[in-house]
Amino acid sequence: MKLCALFAGAVISTSAVAASWEYAWPEEWHQEWPLDEQGPDAWSSSECTVSRLDAFEMEKGRKPVFFSTDPLDDPEAPKMLPLNSTGGEQWEFDGVSEDGQMAFCFGFYRDPNYAILGTGNLRLSAEFSRPNKTRFVRVDYPSSSTVTSCPWGTRGVWKGADYSYTFEVTRDIKVARIGVDAPDLKGSVVMRSVMPPRYPDGSTYPNKEASTEVVPYFRWLEAIPAADVRVDVVMDGQPYRWSGLGGHERLWTAFSWFTCLQAMTAVRVKAGPFAAVHGSFVSAIDKGLYRPSTVLAENDEVIFSTTLHEPSDTEDYAVFTKTYGGRVSGNLKEKATGYELVMVSPSAKKQWSFSITNEAIGFEYMLGEGVGGTGFSGRAVGGSIGLKQYFGPSFAETLEFPKRSYLFKSNYVDAVPEEKGEL
């Protein structure tokens, strides 16, 4: 969630948006995609709302901009309009093959904080790991982005002179697909959710009592916590096809990630009838604030959810620990080779455990001081304690920012009172 894309214009016509989805969608996959019945012109319907943003479009000065804080806002709609100089957002999609040997991650960005890494405020990162441990990475700085929100779903298109990337998500957030048409990367990905969208407190979307703020000024909603995913792309002229575990996240911040976060961990597992997700965030602003949450589903239904990370005799809790002694660790100073996720419900007298083993590095970034971020594809085994244990794919990601950095600086600013008409 997602570091894969974290570091690595002109208004376009409706016809250009519609034409951008020509990515050799496999014929047998059409049954997976419920939006085909809307017809080819659906995305130009008057029922849709269109957000267009080019690479250099930004609100100047300290004027108020829209920043989503309502937990009932459409998860896929833009969260910040227009951009200002401090905040940003991303749509992130990732996946791991069934054998844990391959992974992908797409990041669609509207974020001026990464203009230092390229041209403008738009960014697109596509990363893939291969079975031979090599990785394919493509980072683009598109000239335009368009997000179309309709009653049946959301489409985003990030375009440059000779490439385009598209994501589409159904309104019920159960199915998503990604397409890419670039000189060295073409193809598509489809994922079908096996767990409902969740907030930072683990509750299910929609929930008017929930909050999307996980730590101060940093907001997150796990739109597709876990999904069955299929990948069919061609990179550098070579086919790349597999199925496994996927997920999709929405993240938006009032300030840069470095300003808001000290560290973060994210895990997803799918084994047999079970799907488990764990996320934790450490605030860089409110020192000592640690916000974990864990959710477990069985046969697509949530059966366990908690934010408690210490053992209790009465309350549901989850304990997440690092393990060592395996074959695959990152190149940073942290050398964990896997993880253990244990969930306990004292009232139900039930316990579940999943052991995760890293199989390959999906992506990695060194940020200085021996820290940074690493995403692992892997395998997991687990289930209900004392009952049948299941095997399946896993995804694990850790991020830690250095305490001091010449590249990343805090961009926090105090808000101007709203009665003055400015932020």
From Swiss-Prot:
Coiled coil: none annotated. Its EC number is 5.5.1.-. Glycans are attached at residues 84, 132. Keywords: Glycoprotein, Isomerase, Signal. GO terms for molecular function: isomerase activity. The keyword Electron transport does not apply. Pathway: Secondary metabolite biosynthesis. Induction: Expression is positively regulated by the cluster-specific transcription factor cheR that binds directly to an asymmetric direct repeat present in the promoter. Disruption phenotype: Abolishes the production of chaetoglobosin A. The keyword Glycoprotein applies. It comes from the Eukaryota. Residues 1-18 form the signal peptide. Diels-Alderase; part of the gene cluster that mediates the biosynthesis of chaetoglobosin A which has a unique inhibitory activity against actin polymerization in mammalian cells. Chaetoglobosin A and its intermediates are involved in the morphological differentiation of C.globosum. The first step of the pathway is the synthesis of prochaetoglobosin I via condensation of one acetyl-CoA, 8 malonyl-CoA, and a L-tryptophan molecule by the PKS-NRPS hybrid synthetase cheA, followed by reduction of backbone double bond to install desired geometry by the enoyl reductase cheB. Belongs to the Diels-Alderase family. This is Diels-Alderase cheD. The gene is cheD.
